[in-house]
Curated annotation (Swiss-Prot):
Family statement drawn from the similarity comment of this UniProt entry: Belongs to the imidazoleglycerol-phosphate dehydratase family.
NCBIfam families the UniProt entry points to: PRK00951.1-1, PRK00951.1-5, PRK00951.2-1, PRK00951.2-4
Recorded name of the encoding gene: hisB
Lineage top rank: taxon: Bacteria
Compartmental location: Cytoplasm
Phylogenetic placement of the source organism: Bacteria, Pseudomonadati, Pseudomonadota, Alphaproteobacteria, Rhodobacterales
Protein name listed in UniProt: Imidazoleglycerol-phosphate dehydratase
GO molecular function, one term: imidazoleglycerol-phosphate dehydratase activity
Pfam families to which the protein is assigned, alphabetical: IGPD
Pathway listed: Amino-acid biosynthesis; L-histidine biosynthesis; L-histidine from 5-phospho-alpha-D-ribose 1-diphosphate: step 6/9
InterPro entries reported in the protein's UniProt record: IGPD_sf (IPR038494), ImidazoleglycerolP_deHydtase (IPR000807), ImidazoleglycerP_deHydtase_CS (IPR020565), Ribosomal_Su5_D2-typ_SF (IPR020568)
Gene Ontology CC entries for this record: cytoplasm
Amino acid sequence: MRKAEISRKTAETDISVTVDLDGTGRYDIRTGVGFFDHMMDQLARHALIDITLRCEGDLHIDDHHTVEDCGIALGQALTRALGDKRGIRRYGSFHLAMDDALVRAALDLSGRPFLVWNLPFPTEKIGSFDTELVREFFQAFATHGGITLHVDLIHGVNSHHIAEAAFKAVARSLREAVEPDPRRADAIPSTKGML
């Protein structure tokens, strides 16, 4: 069973997250940050990973701790659900078009966290949401999920479309990478023998 549950409590946030890598993309996200919830819905739906996420954060300060800490907890849950990563495809990539926006994502569930980020936003905010928090989320998610992640904007003029295309592109890449590979049923996808 490729499922995991993580609880994470700090002075800034109180988070619980469950993931099912063999789900259908069901989601129940409540962080108190509307735009971020919308993006997390997209991540779950397009990765076909069931995600339940609850966060009580210090939103009276700003959204930063909530968004970053959700990335940490989700990355930890992914790591736990993958176990030793036996039988997975490991790699995934996807080009995602959404109206004016075209985003490319590529990732490796290598256990070596690294983020390459080339996703400039034309505005500093999407409604009240700081666009810089998109990178903060993916940095935390990649670090705590042990993911090498590249996200590149190929074209885009609308910040909402760019952000949504990024979440969907990463989701589709993740969907490919966590999927069981029938040709490697019980094999670790590395010549090292471990990830």
